[in-house]
Regions:
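ATP-dependent small-molecule kinase phosphotransfer cores
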Residues: 31-134
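Hydrophobic positions on the alpha1 helix immediately C-terminal to the Walker A/P-loop
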Residues: 20
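Conserved lysine of the Walker
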Residues: 17
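Walker A (P-loop) phosphate-binding loop of P-loop NTPases
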Residues: 14
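Hydrophobic anchor at the beta1->P-loop junction of P-loop NTPases
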Residues: 9
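Pre-Walker A (Motif I) flank of P-loop NTPase domains
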Residues: 3-6
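A glycine- and Lys/Arg-enriched "phosphate-lid" helix/loop adjacent to the NTP-binding pocket
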Residues: 104-182
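NTP-dependent small-molecule kinase module
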Residues: 25, 150-223
Length: 223
């Protein structure tokens, strides 16, 4: 059976995942490449109801109030439902799928809740559960958009003001976001993710500049 390819954009909150995912999709459309675009969590869908409760602070006001394994399962079920409903058949028949967040997000945001010594065990469980037991595809390529936490904090506060939206419990917790970034760099190295340094001399690189770096790697993958 001809399996497809799955490209994932990962990074802490405010790192530009949605923007880079969109730019890649626009570029692929221009190049006449067929793809399917997905993003997680799927707010508003029944399968994401528990995720919404968690991020809204209904299970605890702080990320650490909900243990890493419990929180991960909520996100896993949403991904599984999405795979069955939206993109599994397309992927299994050789399709190209572009994802804004994936299993990789639990590796970034949930493993960071655990002491260093327990993170490895958690990652083995997470990947074994989703890619092994649930049968979700393993990504072909993961871009880790690396942005210093002080920059993402500023960008997120600006976004909240501009869009009049409140931060969820992850976004509102600066110490937690710093922990996520530290953890993410370790996970990216362990899992062979493509790290994209999104700043230069403390300033954000232009989004087109970052896109060109991303696109060069995608082209190499697609051949």
């Amino acid at each position: 059976k001809m399996k497809g390819k799955l490209i994932v954009f990962e990074g802490t909150d405010g790192s530009g995942k949605a923007t880079q995912s969109r730019l890649l999709c626009e570029r692929l459309t221009c190049e006449g490449v067929a793809y399917k675009n997905i993003d997680f969590p799927r707010y508003g869908k029944p399968s994401a109801a528990m995720v919404q409760e968690y991020l809204d602070g209904k299970l605890g006001r702080h990320p650490g109030d909900v243990n890493a394994y419990a929180a991960s399962l909520m996100f896993s079920m949403d991904r599984y439902a999405s795979y069955k409903q939206d993109w599994g058949a397309f992927y299994e028949s050789g399709g190209l799928v572009i994802a804004d967040r994936y299993t990789t997000s639990n590796a970034v945001h949930q493993a960071s809740k655990l002491p260093d010594g327990e993170r490895e065990k958690f990652l083995d469980w997470l990947f074994g559960f989703e890619y092994g037991l649930l049968g979700l595809p393993e990504p072909s390529l993961v871009f880790y958009l690396d942005v210093p936490t002080e920059v993402t904090e500023r960008l997120m506060r600006e976004r909240e003001r501009a869009t009049h939206t409140a931060a969820d419990i992850h976004e509102a917790d600066d110490a937690y976001l710093r922990e996520c970034r530290e953890n993410a760099r370790g996970v990216a190295a362990r899992c062979g993710w493509q790290r994209v340094d999104c700043t230069r001399d403390g300033q954000m690189r232009g989004i087109e500049d970052i896109h060109e770096e991303v696109y060069a790697r995608v082209k190499a993958l697609l051949g």
